[in-house]
A protein has these predicted regions:
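Surface-exposed cleft-lining segments at the edges of enzyme active sites
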Residues: 31, 191-201
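Catalytic alpha-helical scaffold of carbohydrate-active enzymes acting on polysaccharides/glycoconjugates
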Residues: 2-187, 203-280
């Protein structure tokens, strides 16, 4: 997990879901509403190839099932395919048995389509934490996962008291890497500079300084993005103003913020980072 600044790898992650995948909103889906994720992922793949970056794609099982060409394209481009669950349901709304079923259903789909069994998981809307869903980590381990990236250490979502850097969760002789997304400490608490919100609302220099500081400390910065965040002209759900703000933000193209970061810093997949940490 540690290394010199010149050799530090950071991680770029994509939560592969449609524009209508917003937790708690029903009535939208394939067959009745247009898909935008294929074209947006294609654009991401082209961009990553142009700057020689490898990423982790956390794919919803329902999306992979509906669009069977998506995961093979991601895998063929050399990226890691990981699990985002099946139905985009909050983990807090699932029983342990239902959570296990979602994992297995998604793993079966992704394994067939990518040729590899996923080793990483990210919960929808950061809905997994050590305090509210402690049972989920053991299930992830038992289902063959080596890492989770769900505990966003923010004051308003995720794991509020969680670490800002990767760590191992121990469970009676078992262990699982927890890899939180990047945040920036402030007097107001941790700020969400590592992804969609960060690209929308914080200045590029602030984000760059956070990456630089982490790398100087021997830590990897983890970024996250949704395909809809590079599609400013795409459709949006008719949500309240607050939920519009949270789910979509202003109509901006996050790639305009991300490309300079990819050119300045080194990026790889989370799976590659875990391999590096465990072989160190």
């Amino acid at each position: 997990m540690r290394g010199t600044n010149q050799r530090m790898n950071n991680a770029l992650t994509i939560d592969v879901e449609e524009w209508f995948h917003v937790c708690g909103v029903a009535g939208y889906g394939y067959g009745t509403h247009p898909s935008h994720v294929l074209r947006n992922v294609d654009r991401l793949l082209e961009c990553f190839a142009a700057v020689d970056v490898t990423a982790t794609f956390f794919v919803l099982g329902s999306v992979a099932e509906a669009l069977p060409s998506l995961v093979p394209a991601i895998a063929a481009a050399g990226h890691e395919v990981a699990s985002h669950g099946f139905s985009h349901t909050l983990i807090t709304a699932l029983s342990p048995a239902a959570f296990r079923d979602e994992l297995r259903r998604t793993n079966d789909i992704l394994s067939i389509q990518s040729g590899k069994r996923p080793i990483g998981f990210r919960a929808p809307q950061w809905s997994l934490s050590r305090t509210v869903t402690p049972w989920a980590f053991e299930i992830l381990h038992d289902e063959g996962f080596r890492y989770d990236s769900s505990c966003n250490p923010l004051p308003f979502v995720g794991d509020r008291s969680g670490s800002r850097v990767p760590y191992k969760i121990g469970m009676a002789g078992k262990s699982l890497w927890e890899i939180p997304p990047m945040v920036t400490p402030s007097m107001l608490g941790n700020l969400p500079t590592g992804g969609g919100w960060g690209f929308r609302f914080f200045p590029p220099r602030m984000i760059e300084r956070t990456v630089q500081r982490l790398n100087e400390e021997g830590q990897s910065a983890v970024f996250y993005l949704h395909p809809r965040e590079i599609d400013p002209s795409g459709p949006r759900l008719p949500l309240s103003l607050f939920r519009q703000f949270v789910a979509y933000g202003p109509r901006t193209d996050a790639l305009q913020r991300l490309v300079p970061l990819m050119k300045r810093f080194r990026f790889t997949s989370l799976g590659n980072l875990v391999d590096q940490w465990e072989s160190a």
